[in-house]
A protein has these predicted regions:
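Cytosol-/stroma-facing membrane-proximal "stalk/adaptor" domains immediately downstream
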Residues: 146-166
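A residue-level signal for beta-strand positions that form part of recognition/binding surfaces
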Residues: 1, 71, 131
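Non-transmembrane, membrane-adjacent beta-strand/coil modules in membrane-associated proteins
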Residues: 10, 81-147
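Conserved beta-hairpin
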Residues: 55-100
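N-terminal membrane-targeting/pre-transmembrane regions
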Residues: 1-45, 123, 149, 166
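Loop-to-helix transition at the N-terminal end of transmembrane alpha-helices
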Residues: 42-60
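Short N-terminal helix-initiation segments at or just after the protein's N-terminus
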Residues: 14-19, 39-45, 72-86, 141, ...
Length: 166
């Protein structure tokens, strides 16, 4: 039974400008060198490299960002945090010592957006500055960025009280 579910994608215009900017440069180089047969740049790479970069960055990067999403689910047993297609993490509710919905500074506190941090202090975020900080029983902290932070914190607290009260 899922008590709370939220799915977020990168929707910032500047992220997509960078993604499509990199892709456009790769497409331009590919068309110049492979399709038109004109070496691209002052010191052009071999054709196989143009093919590789075109597939990775001209096609792969936009597809990757299209499918990249942060999914958060709260169930009676655990909190699931998935940064598809990169990683997923399951945090048992019994390991959560403290829950706090708060405003944070993604760049200052965690170095930006995405999957960030260290083994003791991890953040999963996509956009904005609202999130839920979990303090685990071993002292580690996990920040989950959310567009519905208060609702997420309430769902976690409710599940902890209802299903894990002593």
């Amino acid at each position: 039974m899922i008590i709370f579910r939220e799915e977020q994608r990168f929707r910032q215009w500047w992220v997509w400008l960078m993604v499509y900017g990199v892709a456009a440069i790769q497409w331009w180089g590919f068309i110049q060198q492979i399709v038109l047969g004109k070496p691209w740049g002052n010191n052009p790479g071999p054709d196989w490299m143009m093919w590789l970069f075109w597939v990775l960055f001209g096609i792969g990067l936009p597809i990757f960002f299209h499918f990249l999403r942060l999914t958060v689910e709260v169930t009676p047993e655990h909190i699931f945090v998935g940064y598809r297609p990169l990683t997923k993490r399951i945090i048992p509710l019994s390991n959560v010592a403290r829950v706090e919905a708060r405003t944070y500074k993604p760049i200052r506190e965690y170095g930006g957006y995405g999957l960030r941090g260290t083994s003791r202090n991890t953040a999963y975020n996509v956009s904005g500055n609202q999130g839920v900080e979990l303090t685990l029983s071993d002292g580690r902290r996990v920040m989950i960025g959310s567009q519905r932070a208060a609702e997420l914190a309430l769902a976690i607290d409710s599940a902890r009280r209802k299903y894990h009260s002593e």
